[in-house]
Design a protein with these regions (language model features):
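Glycan-recognition and catalytic cores of secretory/periplasmic carbohydrate-active enzymes
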Residues: 1-184
Length: 184
């Protein structure tokens, strides 16, 4: 079923131009590039890697490759799964630029856009890296889905290059994932 649906997606997007694909990828799409990379890994068929690359949003990727943070105002949980896909593709293709883009994103979000509990957005969007006022003043706290996806990215990065990510892997689930579910 997974392969059939992937083939279906390849078929229905085959007539789209590169610009049309990039326009479509502005919307939240759940990290399809990662899924298609997984299908490539499962099947050994490189056509799925090409599909994964085609579903990679260049507006986010290209600045990350050159170490530029353009995240302010972006819908956070739309971007994180895209980056997970970049990392998955990088791992399968040994693409150092895409790997570095994922690492730069992680470092930027963790070290410049997150608060101590691990949250990194308010009202689902990245705040300015130099102004955390919205995170302190807004009644809506960080999204747990962002935190979950950042944990997934952390795990992927840690598996290929163990770093100082261990405190994030061990502490953030308790401060951001489990805490909102305590009804006492």
């Amino acid at each position: 079923m997974l392969i059939a649906l992937t083939d279906w997606m390849a078929s229905i997007t085959s007539g789209l131009t590169e610009q049309q694909m990039q326009d479509m990828l502005r919307s939240e799409h759940g990290g399809l590039n990662e899924i298609f990379a997984d299908v490539a890994s499962i099947t050994g068929n490189k056509k799925y890697l090409e599909l994964a690359r085609r579903f990679s949003h260049k507006t986010l990727l290209e600045p990350l490759i050159v170490g530029e943070d353009h995240l302010t105002g972006m819908h956070a949980n739309t971007q994180i799964p895209k980056v997970i896909g970049y990392k998955r593709i990088a791992d399968l293709t040994q693409n150092d630029a895409w790997d570095q883009a994922a690492r730069f994103f992680w470092n930027t979000v963790v070290n410049h856009r997150s608060v101590c509990i691990g949250g990194n957005s308010v009202r689902e969007h990245f705040h300015p890296a130099d102004n955390f006022a919205s995170m302190l003043n807004d009644i809506q706290g960080p999204e747990t889905c962002n935190t979950y996806n950042m944990l997934r990215l952390t795990k992927m990065l840690f598996q290929t290059s163990p770093t100082s990510a261990l405190p994030i892997i061990t502490n953030v689930p308790y401060t951001t994932i489990f805490l909102p579910h305590n009804n006492r």
